[in-house]
C-alpha cells in the first residue's frame, strides 16, 4: 500500500491541514510534497469545499488522507472544520496549490518546539512558484542575511512593520492556534482574512515566534488563486489589520494596555513594565527606520528619482 506508514499513524504529533476548492491540477503535487517529509508521525487533513473538477477522485487515491468534501460557508468555515478534526500537538497549514521544498521541515519544527518551551510558533521563508512549476524569487530574502528579532524581541519588529508571518509554512502549537484563530464571533475583517486575525491575536496576547533562516516551502502563482478571487475583500481587511496594530502600539506606549508574554502552555512568563516598554519603543523606532523605504532603496535609485523630480518641477515652471 502506498504510504503505508502514514496510514498506520494513530496518534499524530503533527496535523497538516489543507483547504481545497477546484484546484485538482495542483493537488497531487501538494499531497506528495507533504508525504515526502522525513518526519512520519503526522496526519494530513484536506477540507474540500465541494469541488467539481475531479478533486475527490484524486483524494481517493491516497488512503492515508483524512478528508471531507462539502460546501463551506467561507474560508474561515473550512479552517474551523480542519481544526475540529486535527489531533496533532502541532499544526501546519498548506494550501492546495502550495507545498514543501525542504523534506526535513516537520522534523525541524518538532525538534525546535520540543526544546524551546517559550516558543509557540516556528516559521521560515517561502519561495514563489509559477503555475507550471518554475521556482521564482524567495519572499523576504533579506532575512537570510539579516534575520528579524526572535521570541519576545519580535514584538517591537511586528509593531513597527505589521509583518504577517507566512502561513504556508509556520508550525504552531495546536492549543495556541485554536485559542487565537478567529471564530464566528471575531470582528468582520478577521472573519474575512482569518490569518490576519490569528496574527493579531497571537502577538497581542503575548506568544512568541522563532524564525529559521531557511527556504522551506513554495507558494504557487496561478489563475483563480485566493489572493486574486478575494482581493476586493481581503485588501480592506489588511488595511484594518494595519490600523489595529498601530492602535495597539499606541495603547502600549501610552500605558493603556498591559502586555504580557506567554510560553507555549499559555502561562504568563513576564509582564511589560515601564522600563521594558521604553526599550520596546526604542526598538520600535529603530525598526521603523531600518525598514523604511528610504533605507531599503539603493542610493543611485534615490538620486535618479530626486533628479527626475527636480526636472519635472523646473519643466513645469518653464511651461508657465
Where does each model-flagged region fall?
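Conserved nucleotide-sugar donor-binding catalytic segment
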Residues: 16, 124, 143-238
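Conserved donor NDP-sugar-binding/catalytic core segment of glycosyltransferases
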Residues: 104-138
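N-proximal low-complexity "stem/linker" segments adjacent to membrane-targeting elements
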Residues: 1-33
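A conserved acidic beta->alpha catalytic loop
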Residues: 48-57, 95
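Short, acidic, metal-binding catalytic loop of nucleotide-sugar glycosyltransferases
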Residues: 32-41
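Glycine-rich, basic loop-to-helix element that forms the pyrophosphate-binding segment
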Residues: 70-86, 96
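Short beta-strand/loop segment that forms part of the nucleotide-sugar
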Residues: 41-50, 68-71
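Short aromatic/hydrophobic "clamp" motif used to bind/position activated sugar donors
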Residues: 91-92
Amino acid at each position: 500500500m502506498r504510504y503505508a506508514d502514514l496510514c498506520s499513524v494513530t496518534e499524530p504529533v503533527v496535523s497538516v491541514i489543507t483547504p481545497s476548492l477546484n484546484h485538482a491540477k495542483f493537488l497531487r503535487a501538494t499531497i506528495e510534497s507533504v508525504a515526502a517529509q522525513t518526519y512520519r508521525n503526522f496526519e494530513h487533513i484536506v477540507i474540500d469545499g465541494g469541488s467539481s473538477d475531479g478533486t475527490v477522485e484524486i483524494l481517493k487515491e491516497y488512503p492515508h488522507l483524512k478528508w471531507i468534501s462539502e460546501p463551506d460557508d467561507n474560508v474561515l468555515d473550512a479552517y474551523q472544520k480542519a481544526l475540529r478534526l486535527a489531533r496533532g500537538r502541532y499544526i501546519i497549514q498548506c494550501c492546495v496549490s502550495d507545498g514543501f521544498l525542504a523534506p526535513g521541515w516537520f522534523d525541524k519544527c518538532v525538534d525546535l518546539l520540543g526544546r524551546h518551551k517559550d516558543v509557540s510558533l516556528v516559521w521560515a521563508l517561502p519561495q514563489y512558484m509559477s503555475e507550471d512549476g518554475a521556482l521564482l524569487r524567495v519572499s523576504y530574502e533579506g532575512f537570510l542575511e539579516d534575520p528579524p528579532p526572535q521570541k519576545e524581541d519580535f514584538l517591537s519588529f511586528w509593531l513597527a512593520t505589521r509583518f504577517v508571518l507566512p502561513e504556508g509554512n509556520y508550525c504552531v502549537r495546536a492549543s495556541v492556534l485554536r485559542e487565537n484563530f478567529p471564530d464566528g464571533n471575531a470582528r468582520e475583517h478577521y472573519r474575512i482574512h482569518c490569518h490576519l486575525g490569528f496574527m493579531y491575536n497571537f502577538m497581542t496576547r503575548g506568544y512568541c515566534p522563532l524564525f529559521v533562516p531557511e527556504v522551506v516551502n513554495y507558494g504557487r502563482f496561478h489563475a483563480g488563486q485566493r489572493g486574486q478571487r478575494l482581493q476586493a475583500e481581503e485588501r480592506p481587511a489588511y488595511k484594518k489589520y494595519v490600523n489595529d496594530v498601530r492602535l495597539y502600539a499606541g495603547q502600549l506606549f501610552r500605558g493603556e494596555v498591559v502586555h504580557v508574554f506567554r510560553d507555549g502552555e499559555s502561562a504568563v512568563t513576564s509582564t511589560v513594565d515601564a522600563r521594558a516598554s521604553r526599550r520596546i519603543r526604542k526598538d520600535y523606532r529603530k525598526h521603523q527606520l531600518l525598514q523604511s523605504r528610504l533605507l531599503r532603496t539603493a542610493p543611485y535609485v534615490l538620486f535618479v528619482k530626486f533628479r527626475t523630480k527636480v526636472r519635472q518641477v523646473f519643466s513645469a515652471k518653464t511651461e508657465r
